[in-house]
Amino acid sequence: MHHLRALVGVGLAGLAAGVPLTDKISVKPRQAPGAQNVVYWGQNGGGTIENNDLAAYCQPNSGIDVLVLAFLYQFGNGGNIPSGTIGQSCYISTSGQGQNCEALTAAIHTCQSAGVKIILSLGGATSSYSLQTQAQAEQIGQYLWDSYGNSGNKTVQRPFGSNFVNGFDFDIEVNGGSSQYYQYMIAKLRSNFASDKSNTYLITGAPQCPIPEPNMGVIISNSVFDHLYVQFYNNNNYTVPCALGINGNAPFNYNNWTSFIADTPSAGAKIFIGVPASPLASTGTPSGAQYYAAPDQLAAIVGEYRSDAHFGGIMMWSAGFSDANVNNGCTYAQQAKSILVNGAPCASSGPPSSTPATAPAPTATTMPSSTSVSSPAASPTGGTVPQWGQCGGEGYSGPTQCVAPYQCVKQGDWWSSCR
């Protein structure tokens, strides 16, 4: 994904699943299966700031079918509770407590009621996560289910209250010798999915395009993924380079991906064409423009592969960059939707309108209790941003005070972190 990622901390172990929180959480279909538009939301940088109201991306004409919440970016390394900052305000601590997550919780319900799937992503391009053992991977997998799935578990923190996500995404961009353990985390999640027959959950991944894939290849070879959001950008200089095959870049290796997964447990996975949502999106700087596909270029690429049985749609990084990239009255997400639905970018009349089919709305509407959203204990300095967390940068509007004893250190125009 985009190179600007935050880092936070970790905590304790997960507990066993209990009675589901609710019997049913139906998600309305927004378009025919096999042609979905997936957008990452929750991280800012590169001079863009996304709308902090997630529900704004779930309007009928938003062009978005799946929203991936980014990221829980610290886990392992001695603790088994994933933590991170999602959006400009929702912080999930190393104890699993949610701080300022009420608005996001309400928006998740709104989006699911509108037919938009909500996926929670782990990882990112930082190096604050790793797995040391199979047991640890299984513990973290169980905790994720208990805290974010329809588990019925009331002994753990639930940052989104009784609402639960529609699946879990793995954007593992750091190997560290631990990739062989993720299969156990995914298997633990899937065993819990099976306990909730009223709902359907997804396991998704966002691998880099090179094959062999350096960080997620082993994971994909040993796990069952439903969606693969392949990042066809930022890999011109890899040993086996790959990209979208445009602008003089490396070749587009979509067919290599269908061949690769054919002999893995993920043989049935849908492959999504992962693209930057603006000329700045892939790197946060103008240098990333080489990886950007203009709407007409994207339409040509999709047109060539959309009939493939593995084709799943388009994935883009990210919501904020899409918002800043408007052509013919359409954001990049709306352009992608038009390409998937109509086979061409938006006309000058603006974005296509989605008309979701009628279906029961999710019943999980309870806001987090005071227990589940209690704030982490304040440090002596009153700061809330943990070690490695983002505390500044052009366009950043989140918290800026670091927990003691860390200080906010500038590392570039777009990024400062607590060190």
Curated annotation (Swiss-Prot):
EC number: 3.2.1.14
Annotated Gene Ontology cellular component terms: extracellular region
Active site (record annotation): 173
Superkingdom field: Eukaryota
InterPro entries registered for this protein in UniProt: CBD_sf, Cellulose-bd_dom_fun, Cts1-like, Glyco_hydro18_cat, Glyco_hydro_18_chit_AS, Glycoside_hydrolase_SF, Glycosyl_Hydrlase18_Chitinase
Signal peptide range: 1-18
Record's compositionally biased regions (Low complexity): 350-381
Substrates-to-products reaction catalysed: Random endo-hydrolysis of N-acetyl-beta-D-glucosaminide (1->4)-beta-linkages in chitin and chitodextrins
Intracellular or extracellular location(s): Secreted
Gene Ontology MF terms in the entry: cellulose binding; chitin binding; endochitinase activity
Glycosylation sites per record: 153, 237, 256
GO biological process terms on file: chitin catabolic process; polysaccharide catabolic process
EC main group: hydrolase
The GH18 domain, residue ranges: 35-343
PROSITE patterns, alphabetized: CBM1_2 (PS51164), GH18_1 (PS01095), GH18_2 (PS51910)
Region (Disordered): 350-386
CBM1 domain location: 383-419
Keywords: Carbohydrate metabolism, Chitin degradation, Chitin-binding, Glycoprotein, Glycosidase, Hydrolase, Polysaccharide degradation, Secreted, Signal, Virulence
Protein family (similarity comment): Belongs to the glycosyl hydrolase 18 family. Chitinase class III subfamily.
Function recorded in the entry: Secreted chitinase involved in the degradation of chitin, a component of the cell walls of fungi and exoskeletal elements of some animals (including worms and arthropods). Participates in the infection process and directly acts in the penetration process of the host cuticle.
Name this protein carries in UniProt: Endochitinase 2
Organism: Metarhizium robertsii (strain ARSEF 23 / ATCC MYA-3075) (Metarhizium anisopliae (strain ARSEF 23))
Organism taxonomic ancestry: Eukaryota, Fungi, Dikarya, Ascomycota, Pezizomycotina
